[in-house]
């Protein structure tokens, strides 16, 4: 898929709105995700829960695995690169992935610089905990933003925090007078033009998805109620007892997040959810959301 201008990239991301993007590690899982109604899949060697459990350096997945997943499904395929690792991004662009996630779930390759995403035809999604982070990533060329949450924990609390923080800061920007915007742009380290856009429109200039710790249909619906455009689900599906049923349930929960009766129906008899991690048990260095700036 030939992609280039920022307008085309962000338009492509708009097509995912109201949908669920699922982490998959095999072509078989990708087919389950597609049949369940996922709008795209994220091709990985290990889901975040395994990356967290196994430790070591987490890198871009083997291109062979990604190509096998691309061959198995007709929906768009995304893949992750390390923060700042533009050569991994060049490789993914060369094999034809539809979207690249510059992800804090992998071990950062550069602690000072994110990738210059303008140099790529393929669009990027990046994580953000607050408005400043989101606008910096957009200034670097990101066509889509997601909450960072705390991936691989099955605990939605950080994703909720990041979503609420983003909207709180957007509302604050809207409350400012025009002559106060420059000082605020300096304070949060974001370009004035983007801060002004947020002030005028009351939202981010790109699609904003929820990600990190979403494990149940109720979690997914909660994030939609908090104003997210859609949901990434990582470990929550294929680390659960009945992945096929849970995948379908989460897709339906996102589509019908305003209907408690549907939510009750899809939440029934899903088998065991992923075990999950209480964030109080995480050491500071194990918190993935703090990676990047």
Curated annotation (Swiss-Prot):
User: Which biological pathway?
Assistant: Cofactor biosynthesis; pyridoxal 5'-phosphate biosynthesis
In terms of InterPro entries, this protein maps to: Aldolase_TIM, PdxS/SNZ, PdxS/SNZ_N, RibuloseP-bd_barrel
Which residues are involved in binding D-glyceraldehyde 3-phosphate? 164
UniProt-listed Enzyme Commission number(s): 4.3.3.6
Task: Keyword check for Coiled coil, yes or no.
Answer: no
* Substrates-to-products reaction catalysed: aldehydo-D-ribose 5-phosphate + D-glyceraldehyde 3-phosphate + L-glutamine = pyridoxal 5'-phosphate + L-glutamate + phosphate + 3 H2O + H(+)
Entry keyword set = Lyase, Pyridoxal phosphate, Schiff base
**Where along the chain is the active site annotated?**
80
Q: Which residues does the annotation say bind D-ribose 5-phosphate?
A: 23, 152, 213, 234-235
* CDD domains listed in its UniProt record: pdxS
The processes (GO biological process) annotated in the record are:
amino acid metabolic process; pyridoxal phosphate biosynthetic process; pyridoxine biosynthetic process
Q: Which family does it belong to?
A: Belongs to the PdxS/SNZ family.
Q: How does it assemble?
A: In the presence of PdxT, forms a dodecamer of heterodimers.
Annotated function: Catalyzes the formation of pyridoxal 5'-phosphate from ribose 5-phosphate (RBP), glyceraldehyde 3-phosphate (G3P) and ammonia. The ammonia is provided by the PdxT subunit. Can also use ribulose 5-phosphate and dihydroxyacetone phosphate as substrates, resulting from enzyme-catalyzed isomerization of RBP and G3P, respectively.
What HAMAP family does UniProt report for this protein, alphabetically? PdxS (MF_01824)
- Stated name of the protein: Pyridoxal 5'-phosphate synthase subunit PdxS
Q: Which organism is it from?
A: Thermus thermophilus (strain ATCC BAA-163 / DSM 7039 / HB27)
